[in-house]
UniProtKB/Swiss-Prot annotation:
GO CC annotations, alphabetized: DNA-directed RNA polymerase complex
Functional note: DNA-dependent RNA polymerase catalyzes the transcription of DNA into RNA using the four ribonucleoside triphosphates as substrates.
GO terms of biological process kind: DNA-templated transcription
Source species: Caldicellulosiruptor saccharolyticus (strain ATCC 43494 / DSM 8903 / Tp8T 6331)
InterPro entries, A to Z: DNA-dir_RpoC_beta_prime, DNA-dir_RpoC_beta_prime_bact, RNA_pol_asu, RNA_pol_N, RNA_pol_Rpb1_1, RNA_pol_Rpb1_3, RNA_pol_Rpb1_3_sf, RNA_pol_Rpb1_4
TM helices/strands, residue ranges: none
Positions bound to Zn(2+) 1: 59, 61, 74, 77
Signal peptide: none
Name recorded for this polypeptide: DNA-directed RNA polymerase subunit beta'
């Protein structure tokens, strides 16, 4: 059997026979290694006879050494001569003198053992830990029932009275006997019959029991296997014991736990042989049970067993759990070879697809390639010499390194990798020094700066890996952001400043009004300082169009000529179809950061990535050159404080004094006074800021930096030279005493103190936000990871209706934004002219979207992942364009992960705060990151709004309690009580639809699902998530949020199972539900009934089909317990499962359809 080629993995309970079958021998002694010889003790926990030799090809006693004895079993010490790495895979076992229960199945919630036996966990615990007897066979004793619990005293009395006419026992043995007697088929039938008549709590209990019984019945696991007779001992290399420098030993906690089990087991054996009194044996059995519990899951019951220093020992369960557990530490994230890290510095001389790699680092990373080349070229005659040459860094080595590195891309990664642009490929250029050089334009994608950031380098080894790195990951091919499809490689800071400076105009600059015969002449004049860079001049331009030469005079500045030389002249900013525009410069305005973004966006659309990458590098050169030439820098004298400042402040103080007077005379309330004072100071600050900005010269460096978008903002300028204004106290309430000074003048002590509140809050908030945002991303990835584009078209007829998203009157997302890059689900026809704008299943491009909006369409029916029929994924047509490339999405793209990253990456920018709505009674509305979490976890929101369950007219009654009644024409009516302080959203006599809000607040999505069905809740969640991100100015395409919502809504809760295999109350995937029903209908049986449920992302991630993915996410023990009882099979469909078992992920080039391509030579 090929160990790496399998399609599924199954987990189930191990029977005692199975455990003995795995084992190579019984561990009988608690000894580990001999303290004198340091060799493992025979029959101990590290025994070589059981687990294999500690040294390669060498038995314990030393009779057989060397490879030639391979496979020989030594007649003296019984050790097989083989490789020592078998100690990583050979297992042993311990035969227990008395059976013990497995704590996972007894203690988990709900207790599986308790459910199948119909005993309460408390009674079960009493029996298992020898505190009470359980009746196994009541015989003919009156009033005695099977499974009845007897105390010591009751048992003794009955024993005296009836002798051997009944049987009762305690401990795991008694439970094992009870479990053995269970007939699963019969029990299942009985429970199903009871279910038909049961109601309420009883019904729920029966359903729970039935679930466990069915799990055992279908999986072929026997209930008595939950009780252990034999305990497996894991291979010694997985619980190593190593010698420290001081001659002491460090050992894994597991060895301590195993030793306790063996000690107690041996003692119990001895006591039984001696025929010790029952009470002593009972105590020993209890201790054995507790030792095994601690080994499997320490601390689950009672106090954990502690090691030195009162530290709880790590049990087998702890080895799997949490961030440091096997799953997350070693299986999902491994450290890899051929990697290095170093500090990054800026490399402005690089091309966009290059990075500077320090020589010594490159030599170490490419060592095997260099060695191979050295031998190939005959510089060294064997690999050993080549290795030496490389290690001594001989001079020839460097030339070879240059050769090897050519055309071999490397990957650069900066942690935290929040989206896929956190790892990109570059062609390395060897540099001196020990720092990695990074191109300034890719810093945005990495969120990198040069204040000491470090980055990691990885080398793709195989030819396929190199090809993928070059074509898919090269930085020049990743100019767009996958979250919204906008360019992410846009010049920033100095470059923006340089270009802004370059395109400024200055009235009366040197040489203004001169006329030049050509661009070259004008630039020559500028170089010789005859004209200034910003002077308005005239230039003759000559252009060849359709074979004829057009020439004419254009008004411009030398700076704009320089900029337009690097920018293509047909980007569509100027309408060239008009004769008078033929000679105009493409970019004839002041260029700030926004404009640069537009230019690059157009470049990508018109010219594609390769040409754009070249243009970007040229813009970068210009930007740096002219920000240097312009020598733009900040000094204290640049902060000009407006003269009117004192006057404005005096006026404000007078107004505040008047308001205080009104308050003292009792004409206004304290609250009104406070609000008016605050609004006065805010107005004053704004007025001052306006004055300040008007006052600054347009060549003032601070003004240039802010208005070009290079650095800083209006608000910051106002703090430097205006006034700092109002500050908030730690609880978030505004302090009414403003800070009247600015930083140029300096703050006084009280002002400084007030401003520290906000500063500290900001830092604390940022730290909290980073952690919360990371956890949100992790949950999103986990819920969406198995969504991969699996086919071109799923063939569904359905789509969703989209219209603009509004919040009150404000448009949050326009219709155009929502439909670009999607496929139409119906023909879209212009109502006025009757022409078909776009056919069904055709892509809606920007032009088409504009046409649709111009035709006055208010809503459009488009394909969406929410209605996609593809199982385990989505199809190209429902997904639409891949925003990272601007092309239709490829089959194999892991769109689920991309969606999770798109939503999670801006998480750190969202605020944490809860806004207080005005008034005391108004409830807080959650916003920012907590609101996103609340939506994705489908929680009942804080400050829940009352929604109408029917449509009709509203009547509002105000008696002791406010009530709202909704009536419709069919005579239906519903009445809702309005809690004190809630603000109404409707007026008397208004008409409302089902699902409309009656009071302010957030809607509970579960209610919405009940009232308006799946579509209603989907659009609500989408709009609400978009609102939060748009408030922070973050653009995320709808399709990403839709993918997450799709995952939250893919389950059905069974209400009535009909004649199917399903159980009532089960939550199953829609596909499975439909399959079962189709089967039932085909066989003429009654299909099941169910309703769609909305699961929060954590719950949805845990209820996935794959137990490996769920176990590596959260609640590891619970997931595995459940999976083992059900005998679950993991079909290895998602990404995580495959990463865990070390296969290629089934996405991208790892998909089966790509893996099966074979290249054949043509004859």
């Amino acid at each position: 059997m090929d160990l790496f080629n399998f399609d599924a993995i199954k987990i189930s309970l191990a029977s005692p026979e199975k455990i003995r079958e795995w084992s190579r021998g019984e561990v009988k002694k608690p000894e580990t290694i001999n303290y004198r010889t340091l060799k493992p003790e025979k029959d101990g926990l590290f025994c070589e006879k059981i687990f294999g030799p500690t040294k390669d090809w060498e038995c314990h006693c030393g009779k057989y050494k060397k490879v030639k004895y391979k496979g020989v079993v030594c007649d003296k010490c019984g050790v097989e001569v083989t490789k020592s790495k078998v100690r990583r895979e050979r297992m042993g076992h311990i035969e227990l003198a008395a059976p013990v229960s497995h704590i996972w199945y007894f203690k988990g919630v709900p207790s599986r053992m308790g459910l199948i036996l119909d005993m309460t966990p408390r009674n079960l615990e009493k029996v298992l830990y020898f505190a009470a007897y359980v009746v196994i066979d009541p015989g003919d004793v009156p009033n005695l029932e099977k499974k009845q619990i007897l105390s010591e005293k009751e048992y003794r009395e009955l024993k005296e009275k009836y002798g051997d006419r009944f049987r009762a026992g305690m401990g795991a043995e008694a439970i094992k006997e009870l479990l053995k007697e269970i007939d699963l088929d019969k029990l299942s039938q009985e429970l199903r019959q009871e279910l038909e008549t049961a109601t309420g709590q009883k019904k729920l209990k029966i359903i729970k029991r039935l679930e466990v019984v069915e799990a055992f019945r279908k999986s072929g696991n026997r209930p008595e296997w939950m009780i252990l007779d034999v305990i497996p001992v894991i291979p010694p290399e997985l619980r190593p014991m190593v010698q420290l420098d001081g001659g002491r030993f460090a050992t894994s906690d597991l060895n301590d736990l195993y030793r306790r089990v063996i000690n107690r087991n041996n003692r119990l054996k001895k006591l039984m042989e001696l025929g010790a009194p029952d009470i002593i044996i009972r105590n020993e059995k209890r201790m054995l049970q507790e030792a095994v519990d601690a080994l499997i899951d320490n601390g689950r019951r009672g106090r954990p067993v502690t090691g030195p220093g009162n530290r709880p020992l790590k049990s087998l369960s702890d080895m799997l759990k949490g961030k440091q557990g096997r799953f997350r530490q070693n299986l999902l994230g491994k450290r890899v070879d051929y990697s290095g890290r170093s500090v990054i510095v800026v490399g402005p001389e690089l091309k966009i697809y290059q990075c500077g790699l320090p020589k010594e680092m490159a030599l170490e990373l490419f060592k095997p390639f260099v060695m191979k080349k050295l031998v190939e070229k005959g510089i060294c005659n064997n690999i050993k010499n080549a290795k030496k040459a490389v290690e001594r860094q001989r001079s020839e080595v460097w030339d070879i390194l240059e050769e090897v590195i050519k055309d071999h891309p490397v990957l650069l990664n900066r942690a935290p990798t929040l989206h896929r642009l956190g790892i990109q490929a570059f062609e390395p250029v060897l540099v001196e020094g020990r720092a990695i050089r990074l191109h300034p334009l890719v810093c945005t994608a990495y969120n990198a700066d040069f204040d000491g950031d470090q980055m990691a380098v990885h080398v793709p080894l195989s030819a396929e890996a190199q090809a993928e790195a070059r074509f898919l990951m090269l930085s020049a091919n990743n100019l767009l952001k996958p979250a919204d499809g906008k360019p992410i490689v846009v010049p920033t800071q100095d470059m923006v400043l340089g270009i802004y400076y370059l395109t400024l105009e200055k009235k009366g600059d040197k040489g203004e009004g001169k006329i030049f015969s050509s661009e070259d002449e004008a630039l020559l004049a500028y170089e010789h300082k005859v004209v200034g860079l910003h002077a308005r001049i005239k230039v003759r331009r000559t252009i060849e169009k359709d074979g004829e030469v057009v020439s004419g005079i254009v008004e411009t500045t030398p700076g704009k000529i320089i900029l337009n030389q690097v920018i293509p002249q047909d980007l569509g900013f100027v309408d060239r179809s008009k004769k008078e525009n033929l000679l105009k410069y493409e970019i004839d305005t002041l260029v700030d950061k926004k404009m640069l973004g537009k230019i690059i966006d157009r470049c990508i659309k018109v010219y594609g990535t390769t040409r754009t990458a070249e243009i970007l590098d040229e813009i970068k050169e210009l930007g740096f050159r002219f920000s240097t030439r312009g020598a733009i820098t900040i000094s204290v004298s640049d902060m000009v404080i407006p003269e009117v400042k004192q006057k404005l402040i005096a006026e404000a103080e007078q107004k505040v004094e008047n308001i205080e007077k009104l308050y003292r005379h009792g004409l206004i309330s304290d609250e009104e006074r406070y609000e008016q004072v605050i609004s006065i100071w805010n107005e004053t600050k704004d007025k001052l800021t306006e004055e300040l900005i008007q006052n600054l010269d347009e060549f003032n460096p601070i003004f240039m930096m802010a208005s070009s978008g290079a650095r800083g903002s209006k608000n910051q300028i106002s703090q430097l030279a205006g006034m700092r204004g109002l500050m908030a106290n730690p609880s978030g309430k505004t302090i009414e005493m403003p800070i009247k000074s600015n930083f140029r003048e300096g703050l006084n002590v009280i002002e400084f103190f007030i401003s520290t509140h906000g500063a500290r809050k900001g830092l604390a908030d940022t730290a909290l936000r980073t952690a919360d945002s990371g956890y949100l991303t992790r949950r999103l990835v986990d819920v969406a990871q198995d969504i991969i584009v699996r086919e071109e078209d799923c063939g569904t007829e359905k789509g969703i209706e989209v219209s603009e998203i509004r919040d009150g009157t404000e448009v949050i997302e326009t219709l155009e934004e929502r439909i670009i890059g999607r496929y139409a689900a119906k023909d879209i026809i212009n109502e006025k002219t009757g022409e078909v704008i776009v056919k069904r299943n055709e892509l809606i491009t920007e032009e088409i979207a504009k046409k649709i909006v111009d035709a006055g369409e208010k809503s459009v029916y488009v394909r969406s992942v929410l209605e996609c029929k593809t199982r385990y994924g989505v199809c190209t047509k429902c997904y639409g364009l891949d925003l990272g490339t601007g092309q239709p999405v490829n089959v194999g793209e892991a769109v689920g992960i991309i969606a999770a990253q798109a939503i999670g990456e801006p998480g750190t920018q969202l605020t944490m705060r809860t806004f207080h709505t005005g008034g005391i009674a108004g409830q807080d509305i959650t916003q920012g990151l907590p609101r996103v979490e609340e939506l994705f976890e489908a929680r009942k929101p804080k400050g829940v709004a009352i929604i109408s369950e029917i449509e009709g007219y509203v009547s509002i009654k105000e008696d002791k309690k406010r009530t709202i009644t909704v009536r419709n024409d069919n005579g239906e009516e519903r009445t809702y009580e309005v809690p004190y302080g809630a603000r109404l959203k409707v007026n008397d006599g208004d008409y409302v639809k089902a699902g409309d809000e009656l009071t302010e607040g957030s809607i509970n999505p579960h209610d919405l699902l009940r009232i308006k069905g799946p579509r209603g809740v989907q659009s609500y969640l989408l709009a609400e998530v978009q609102k939060v991100y748009k408030m922070q100015g973050v653009d995320i395409n709808d399709k990403h949020i839709e993918i997450i919502i799709r995952q939250m809504m893919k389950k059905v809760k069974i209400e009535d199972p009909g004649d199917t295999e399903l159980l009532p109350g089960d939550i199953v995937e829609i596909y499975r539900f439909e399959e079962e029903n189709d089967r039932a209908i085909a066989e003429g049986k009654r299909p099941a009934l169910g309703r769609r449920v909305l699961l929060g992302i954590t719950k949805a991630a845990l209820s996935t089909e794959s137990f490996l993915s769920a176990a590596s996410f959260q609640e590891t023990t619970r997931v595995l317990t459940d999976a083992a009882i059900k005998g679950k099979v993991d079909p290895l469909i998602g990404l995580k499962e495959n990463v865990i078992i070390g296969k290629l992920i089934p996405a991208g080039t790892g998909m089966a359809k790509y893996r099966n391509i074979i290249v054949e030579e043509k004859a």
